[in-house]
Each structure stands twice: as C-alpha cells, then as structure tokens.
Amino acid sequence: MKLRLSIILAGMIAVFGCSHASMPVVGVSCSRSGSGSALLPTTYTDALRSAGAVPLVIPTVSDEAQAAAVMEVVDGIVFSGGEDVNPAWYGESVWNETVEIDSVRDRSDSLLARAALACGKPVLAICRGSQLMNVILGGSLYQDLPSQFSGSVAHSGKTHKIGLEEGSVLAGLYGTDSLTVNSMHHQAVKDPAPGIRITARSADGIVEAWETPQIVAVQFHPEKMLAAGDSAWLPLFKAFVSRTAQR
C-alpha cells in the first residue's frame, strides 16, 4: 500500500505540478470500504468543480512523508464527512454502540490535518471534518448527542436554523444572522479547541460552525444542499476555492 501510494503521489505531482496557475487543486479526504477502497460521495467533487477547482480524492496516507507529499500537490484540502472520530484521540473511552470508528482513516486524516496546518493550506472541514479538526487542535466531542445532550433541536435527518456570529465568514457571505441547514449527525463539538472562534450555533447551543484564519468548519453538509439544487451554497465553496487560489 505504501509503495502504491508513493507511485500515485509521484504521478499526481507530474500531472498537476504545472496546472496550478490556471485552476487550484483541492484535495478531499475520503472514507474506506470494507475491502479498503476509497469512498467519497460525488457531491464533494461536484461542488468543488462548480466553484472552479480541480478536486483530487486523497487515499489514506500512513506516515508524515506521504502527508507532506500530498501537500506539495494540493492548494487546499476539504476534510469530508464519514465515520466517528475515535474518542481515544481526545482522552475518552467509547461511550456506546452508536460510535463507529475507522482507525486507519483517523490516522490518515490526522496526518493530513497536521501537514495542512504546518504549511498553511486553507482547510474546509465538513461534518466529521469539523469534529476532526477540533480534536486535532485540542478540543473534544459529544460522542452521541441523543444520549449525552438534552437539546430541543433534532440533529439527525432534519433541517433547522442556526444563528451566525457577526463578522464570521458565513455572516459575511450571506449577509444575515441566521441560515437554515441540513442536519445528519449524532456527534458534535463539546469543548472547543483553544484559539478557535465559534461562529454558528443551533437554537439549543450545539456548535454548527467555527473558524480560524486557516480553517472554515461547518457541522452541516453544504455540498448536499448544493447538489439538491440550493445554489445559495455555491458561494461558500467559491470563497474557499478563492482562498486556495491565492496561495
């Protein structure tokens, strides 16, 4: 697997190395099938293409050198949704049977996240991606909202409103103090990592978005809403792609 990934990365550098001047290349993390195949809904790549980027699905990496090689190819990275982040990463044991973990992906995403942070690549973190980045930066998660949090909002399979913080990326893009978003998660940020700015919450207080100068993180799935015909979410991806093009 290590040799195969090295060959893939070498090919990627050869193919994309001279294309950055025209279109930014944006990496996207992905899940794995039971047999180890890379899995990613096309909604992510479609959204990035619509925003003017060349999307590049990133297979799992196994060491810092591979993660660094990926960063040589991409101008930014999207951390996508998927499995739950292993609670051991934030000092807890598994809460209950609802927690589904892929330790191989956790390690890969952690390596990619740390490499992206180290070299200043713009990051868009979606759902699991938001949770992952919060953990990487020193925060923790609710492992299972239905059993750990008493809230008034249904966070799985529903839509609901979120309140936006003035001066945030989302508030600036949409010129409003609230948005309606989809919701399909059972985990969420519990203790925010030091240094991050919480920029959106649901009515019951769950973190729905946060940011740093390098990261925009959302708990909801803008790519799914865009794919369903809600073009209002394209500006979020365009703003991210614009940031990657400035590097």
Protein language model annotation of sequence segments:
Residues 2-8, 12-126, 135-136, 142, ...:
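N-terminal beta1-alpha1 cap of cysteine-dependent amidohydrolase-like domains
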Residues 127, 185, 221:
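Active-site glycine-centered loops adjacent to acidic/histidine catalytic or metal-binding residues
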Residues 130-132:
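Hydrophobic, aromatic-enriched interface-forming segments
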Residues 180-186, 210:
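Short catalytic/ligand-gating loop segments at beta-alpha or beta-beta junctions
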Residues 195, 212-215:
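Beta-strand-turn-beta hairpins that frame and shape the catalytic cleft
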Residues 206-212:
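Short, surface-exposed beta-strand/loop micro-motifs that present aromatic residues
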